[in-house]
Amino acid sequence: MNRRRFLQLSASATGLLALRPLVAAENAAPPTGKGASFFLASDTHYLANKEQPDAMDETSRGINTRLIEWLNKLPGTEVPAEAGGGMVGEVSGVIHSGDLIDTGDKNGAAHVAMQKTEWAAFTADWGLNGGDGKLRFPVREVWGNHDGPQGKGLVIDGLRERNSRRKEVSVSENGMHFSWDWNGVHFVNVGLVVGASKDVVRPRRYAALESLDFLTKDLAERVGDSGRPVVITHHVDVARYCAPLDPELVSKNEWDYADVAAYHAVLTKYRVAAILYGHTHVRKIFPWDGATPKLAKDAPPGKGISVFNTDNSGHFNSETQALMYFTVTEKEVFAREFATPDAWLTAAWTPQVWRFPIA
């Protein structure tokens, strides 16, 4: 059984939706007034043809082409009542939570050639600032473990160059992390994982590239005590990496629990509307108080930061894909899911709404 199938079965068995979704009858109408609306996509895994590395895999190419088409045409369309109703408004942009391509974690001449093809296809589709690719909106992406887990390589170099051209953002000194504002909401993209805590000196499996330092400084300088809502995006999930482990085992984890704890400690000083990530290829939505999330099917909603672990949006090895549509206001986060059972040939709104106040 592969990781993807294991996670799908686990999610189904546990019902990991500790933040209870609303239905239309429970005050699920979209919020009105000032706010930031945007799409969230993840795990597109652009894949080149292994036998012909300078060409894209046809399945990957088709899925991601159709994904971009859906993103472009959703604004202005109606949302059914069972998914909250209303219209999809014009969005400020699209956030992509990583694994842009598939082979950035692999070595060898053939894989390097594949990376070039995959990266060229991704940038041609997604563009950068809106209208300079097939996507008509700005994209704000982070990198995932399939893009460059050790913080080096073609995609990492490409992202650093893209960040230098990205409009209306504040970029970290190393060029890899950035923040921006959309309609009164502050957004921070912090890469693969958040770290590394200087209080714990030991090897890490993945390179954080000083994302914790950037996040700490950015929030202090650009949000401070203003009370503005904050949205954080990274790639790896917090759910599995909150609990302490034997020091001899922790370096095998994708995210060191000490870094997860340090990350949460920084966030407690601010009004965090949402944490966004992908990686698991399964949608999970829950409140996070810094501890391992409760997995019981009937777990109470509880208190904590609203975490949105979105499904894959363009993976070549799956018919089922999804993206999310958010509106974040001064007081609440309002989220819906748009999903496909057949690799974006058709798609529909999931009959649920997630609406949570910002503490």
Kindly give the residue locations of the regions a language model identified.
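Short, flexible/disordered intra-domain loops and linkers
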Residues: K50-S60, K106-T117, D199-R204, A243-W255
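N-terminal active-site segment of His-dependent metallophosphoesterases
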Residues: A24-V112
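Extended active-site neighborhood of metal-dependent phosphoesterases/phosphodiesterases
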Residues: T103-G224, A262-T268, I285-A335, A347, ...
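Short acidic, glycine-rich surface-loop motifs adjacent to enzyme active sites
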Residues: R222-C242
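N-terminal secretory signal peptides
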Residues: M1-N2
